Amino acid sequence: MQQQSNIRNFAIIAHIDHGKSTLADRLIEYCNALEAREMCQQVLDSMDIEKERGITIKAQTVRLVYKADDGCVYHLNLMDTPGHVDFAYEVSRSLAACESSLLVVDASQGVEAQTLANLYQAVDNNHKILIVLNKIDLPAANPQQVQQQIEDVIGIDASDALMISAKIGLGIKDVLQAIVTKLPSPNGDSQSQLKALLIDSWYDSYLGVVILVRVVDGKIEKGMRIRMCSNNAVYTVENVGFFSPKKQISGVLYTGEIGFVTAAIKQVADCRVGDTITDDKKPCAQILPGFKPNLPVVFCGLYPSDASQFNHLKDSLQKLRLNDASFEFEQESSGALGFGFRCGFLGLLHLEIIQERLEREFDLDMITTAPSVMYKVYLNTGKVIDVHNPADLPEMQKIKSMSEPWVEATIFIPDQYLGAILGLCTEKRGVQVDLTYVNGRAKLVYLLPLNEIVFDFYDKLKSYSKGYASFDWQMNSYKQSDLIKLSILVNGNPVDALSTIVHRSKAEFRGRELCKRLKDLIPAHLFQIAIQAAIGSRIIARETIRALRKDVLAKCYGGDITRKRKLLEKQKAGKKRMRNIGNVEIPQSAFIAALKITNKD
């Protein structure tokens, strides 16, 4: 049993690509947690998608054993967290399990938007902050200027910030020494009843549901009967251990420690992230506060390409939700696509990652509908309803008004790109709140409609600023807007999967653009196909796919013109009849094209 005073629990937080995972690699390497042949880049990024994209998606934990200069052996529980705003929920769960944070800042880039967002979360959790300036070996690094920037922008003392280069291993011992001397040990009563926080869970085909816990009071050991406080489900603990980063069976976890527990849990719904776990025989008197779940902000429909795969998709979504608590889904049906699920995500990257994981890990082939956000619809009757699926929107004459979600966006950019970014924000219906300058960089605060930023705002921001802009946002409020439903009709029949809710000023552009895309993607038939964009009963854009022509005169070598005319009239009548009864098959690529429409001038 390790003394509680010799345990340190800390999270590594930073903006995207400031070196969190590389620093975690160096700490693991220095503590000899893995042999040299087992080390690789981003060793804690276990998913293929993480390695390919070079980003952290899942927060990971590892226990390191470090012998300090004072001769004592310390157990360091490190949690590597994602930097992207779409995975902020992973960060909040990691912070709830720790007492302190390493704030990593790139010495060449300085303070970025997500640096601030993650730091404020850590401060809200009463964390002790240790500032680490990374990449000081780069020619563009300016540690003194970044220290000043941290003090000016964030308002915390950076005079004793640690100077390191995680890539070449410079200053790693200083970081470890600072962790054991400056960061606090966990609080908690080792003699009290068991009280543990459920941080994460995932599904294992052999072990059932595996849960990751932080023991706040007491201890959890093999053979113990544990109870989930949210639903009173009781299980017998089969195995207890920790990650080093390989899985190690210890048989017991004491106060302040972080590790995994298996208990033959088969019900996915029994494990709710943020739940309190206690001893079934001697339950704790008060449950832990947990943490507030992030509400999804982007919604889309997921449908199996083959209807027989519906149950497989349902099982896959349930297993994935166990591993990603910020993702939500509910069953729905569509006239064009059949049975599927309406899913909620924290952003467009989150949507992309979930879709890719479903395809890779569960071998699913799916159709994804256009993303939308949650709107508040005020009816003439006085009732207020939430709508995130355009197909559920009532008729326009029944609607008094509609409100859409607005966000407060914080953007950091070098001065020379300010004009282009101000133009982009104005184009997206933004309202400027604040503009300040710090050491040659501008900090912009804008209010923007969420519907405008979920599609292509981030891509355009990076393009306009040559990749130098950083961006973070948080929900602000709902505001009344002139919103309408844009319907797409193919051959006179509405396709509900392609309908969207848009601002009236953008409706004509989006309708025309979508009709053009569909004209290129829907194959020609033996009859003419009309593709129309409509607002209510008014058509605002139209494209026509010409009919394939069968040459009925091929066998007529000369002869009377009336014979040819008779054959052409017969073909014309047949095409007219076919247009009335024929079905148009819309390929999957047409639905995917709806995602890629950008507001180009």
Curated annotation (Swiss-Prot):
Domain (tr-type G): residue spans on this chain: 5-187
InterPro entries: EF-4, EFG_III/V, EFG_V-like, EFTu-like_2, G_TR_CS, LepA_C_sf, LepA_CTD, LepA_IV
Topology relative to the membrane: Peripheral membrane protein
Pfam families: EFG_C, GTP_EFTU, GTP_EFTU_D2, LepA_C
Keywords: Cell inner membrane, Cell membrane, GTP-binding, Hydrolase, Membrane, Nucleotide-binding, Protein biosynthesis
GO cellular component, one term: plasma membrane
Domain of life: Bacteria
Gene Ontology BP annotations: positive regulation of translation
Enzymatic reactions: GTP + H2O = GDP + phosphate + H(+)
Signal peptide: none
Localization in the cell: Cell inner membrane
Record-listed E.C. numbers: 3.6.5.n1
SUPFAM superfamilies for the chain: EF-G C-terminal domain-like, P-loop containing nucleoside triphosphate hydrolases, Translation proteins
Coiled coil: none
Keyword set includes Transferase: no
Amino acids binding GTP: D17, H18, G19, K20, S21, T22, N134, K135, I136, D137
Gene Ontology molecular function terms on file: GTP binding; GTPase activity; guanosine tetraphosphate binding; ribosome binding; translation elongation factor activity
CDD domains listed in its UniProt record: EF4_II, EF4_III, LepA, lepA_C
HAMAP family reported in the protein's UniProt record: LepA
Family the UniProt entry places it in: Belongs to the TRAFAC class translation factor GTPase superfamily. Classic translation factor GTPase family. LepA subfamily.
Functional summary from the UniProt entry: Required for accurate and efficient protein synthesis under certain stress conditions. May act as a fidelity factor of the translation reaction, by catalyzing a one-codon backward translocation of tRNAs on improperly translocated ribosomes. Back-translocation proceeds from a post-translocation (POST) complex to a pre-translocation (PRE) complex, thus giving elongation factor G a second chance to translocate the tRNAs correctly. Binds to ribosomes in a GTP-dependent manner.
Protein name: Elongation factor 4
